[in-house]
């Protein structure tokens, strides 16, 4: 019997009810992500990587707007660090994030004869792809790498452990405490616990992420 079997209280039932209410919308959003992997351009995939580089300590809507503005103006693909930083008003660590974007662009988009899609396609495993991104792209940690791989439709089984998700995992007794920071070992340990909970309540990992995010924010964003 699952260790979550006796935890069928109002909180868990509320998660299940919310999932049934939002399931169709969640599936639609995930289908959009799959379309990105199947038909998106290399530039569109890079834009998703930039979005995920921007997300730490920043609102998703602001990150999306910044990427849209920089794409429209061409700064994202041609601008220097200072020009990109000017577009990140409202975010934290704008100079550092701008530098990460330029380095990723020069390494992945401009300086690599093999596309990011080809690299990930050869890896063909979500966990290994995440490790590759963490090792090779500055500004990308385990959360951001999982977020990126989900958003481009490459993998839907990785945990995206931001503060909203961690807060709810504690409420659901999946974890005992809210960690101030996460080492690689801690991240992977919590991911396994979230996967166990996902199986116990019969909500796929990628769907569960959206449900817990919606519970906190009232939105289903990317």
Region locations from a protein language model:
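C-terminal accessory module of base-excision DNA glycosylases/AP lyases that mediates lesion recognition
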Residues: 1-36, 98, 113-222
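Structure-specific DNA junction-binding interface
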Residues: 1-73, 77-91, 221
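Hydrophobic (often cysteine-bearing) scaffold residues that line and stabilize catalytic clefts
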Residues: 42, 46, 59, 97, ...
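Amphipathic alpha-helical interaction segments
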Residues: 48-49, 83, 99-103, 147, ...
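Short, hydrophobic/amphipathic alpha-helical patches that form generic packing surfaces
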Residues: 48-57, 103-106, 150, 209-217
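Alpha-helix N-cap and coil->helix boundary residues
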Residues: 61-65, 79, 96, 143, ...
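Alpha-helical ds-nucleic-acid-binding substructure associated with the helix-hairpin-helix region
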Residues: 67-138
């Amino acid at each position: 019997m699952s260790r979550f079997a006796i935890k069928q209280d109002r909180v868990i039932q509320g998660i299940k009810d919310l999932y049934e209410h939002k399931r169709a919308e969640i599936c639609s959003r995930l289908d959009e992500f799959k379309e990105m992997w199947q038909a998106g351009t290399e530039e569109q995939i890079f834009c998703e990587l930039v979005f995920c580089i921007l997300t730490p300590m920043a609102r998703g809507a602001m990150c999306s707007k910044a990427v849209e503005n920089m794409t429209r103006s061409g700064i994202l693909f041609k601008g220097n660090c200072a020009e990109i930083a000017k577009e990140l008003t409202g975010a934290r660590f704008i100079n550092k994030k701008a530098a990460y974007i330029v380095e990723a662009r020069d390494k992945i988009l401009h300086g690599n004869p093999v596309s990011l899609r080809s690299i990930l396609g050869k890896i063909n495993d979500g966990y290994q792809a995440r490790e590759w991104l963490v090792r090779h792209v500055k500004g990308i940690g385990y959360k951001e790498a999982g977020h990126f791989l989900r958003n481009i439709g490459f993998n839907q089984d990785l945990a995206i452990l931001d503060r909203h998700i961690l807060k709810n995992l504690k409420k659901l007794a999946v974890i005992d405490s809210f960690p101030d920071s996460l080492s690689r070992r801690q991240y992977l340990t919590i991911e396994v616990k979230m996967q166990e909970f996902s199986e116990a309540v019969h909500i796929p990992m990628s769907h569960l992420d959206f449900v817990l995010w919606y519970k906190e924010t009232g939105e289903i964003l990317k």
